[in-house]
């Protein structure tokens, strides 16, 4: 099914694909009348990604029906990263088995990316009984993950009433990042019970790569449960990650 969709801000779209490409090698994007979506799992089956971009966030969204396009994420990322901040991104598909990517700025540059067959798995985003919901600034999360990487390959999230802690412990070193609602970096915190869970630092680093410093990131987790991380894309869109916990001995 032919389609043409236009996104004002090629770099923003490229950052989304760049983040996803750190975790998955290929993806099947569903282009439907209500919007563009993608759900995939990394090869190690540790992280589930769910991308939802409603038609309303595009400046033009023209499709009659539904189309699934499979792409090599590394190739897709490299093309998109050729766009500048103010470039307009146009994605088109005609009758041929190519995705046409046009970057409109000081010149109009068009790339043709061959589509590939991607196995579409039935992946559900489960409703889990999380006991914590924390909203933090993207900058805080990114810096905490960098701090933790100096000490350990895992980071522990600890939530108590009015307090959210990110902590990493190595053989000889440790680091603790403590936030309360009095701190600018913690925007909201709801804790049903004291909760602890640990996660892999390298996965969190990949998940946080595309987050802007001023973005609001929603973290949900429970005791030794997966971490659900959501961040909004132009208010109505959303990128969600579900990261399996590190079970500590």
Swiss-Prot record:
Pfam family, one: PCNA_N
Manganese among keywords: no
SUPFAM superfamilies the UniProt entry points to: DNA clamp
A single GO BP: regulation of DNA replication
Keywords associated with the record: DNA replication, DNA-binding
Source organism superkingdom: Archaea
Molecular function (Gene Ontology), one example: DNA polymerase processivity factor activity
PANTHER family recorded: PROLIFERATING CELL NUCLEAR ANTIGEN (PTHR11352:SF0)
Quaternary structure, from the entry: Homotrimer. The subunits circularize to form a toroid; DNA passes through its center. Replication factor C (RFC) is required to load the toroid on the DNA.
NCBIfam families in the cross-refs: pcna, PRK01115.1-2, PRK01115.1-4
Protein family membership: Belongs to the PCNA family.
Protein name (record): DNA polymerase sliding clamp
């Amino acid at each position: 099914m032919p389609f043409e969709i236009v996104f004002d801000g090629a770099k923003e779209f490229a950052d989304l694909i760049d983040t996803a490409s750190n975790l998955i090698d290929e993806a099947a994007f569903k282009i439907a009348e209500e919007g563009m979506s993608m759900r995939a799992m990394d090869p190690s089956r540790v992280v589930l990604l769910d991308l939802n971009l409603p038609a309303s966030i595009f400046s033009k969204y023209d499709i009659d029906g539904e189309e699934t396009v499979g792409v090599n994420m590394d190739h897709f990322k490299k093309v998109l990263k050729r766009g500048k901040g103010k470039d307009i991104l146009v994605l088109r598909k005609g009758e041929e088995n190519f995705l046409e990517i046009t970057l409109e700025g000081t010149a109009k540059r068009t790339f043709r990316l061959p589509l590939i067959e991607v196995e579409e798995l039935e992946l559900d985003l489960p409703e889990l009984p999380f006991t914590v919901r924390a909203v933090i600034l993207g900058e805080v999360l990114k810096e905490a993950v960098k701090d933790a990487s100096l000490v350990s390959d895992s980071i522990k999230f600890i939530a108590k009433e009015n307090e959210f802690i990110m902590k990493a412990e190595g053989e000889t070193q440790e680091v603790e990042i403590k936030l309360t609602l009095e701190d600018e970096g913690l925007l909201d915190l709801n804790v049903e019970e004291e909760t602890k869970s640990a996660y892999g630092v390298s996965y969190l680093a990949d998940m946080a790569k595309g987050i802007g410093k001023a973005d609001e990131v929603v973290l949900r987790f429970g005791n030794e449960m997966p971490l659900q991380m959501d961040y909004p894309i132009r208010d109505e869109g959303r990128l969600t990650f579900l990261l399996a916990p590190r079970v500590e001995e």
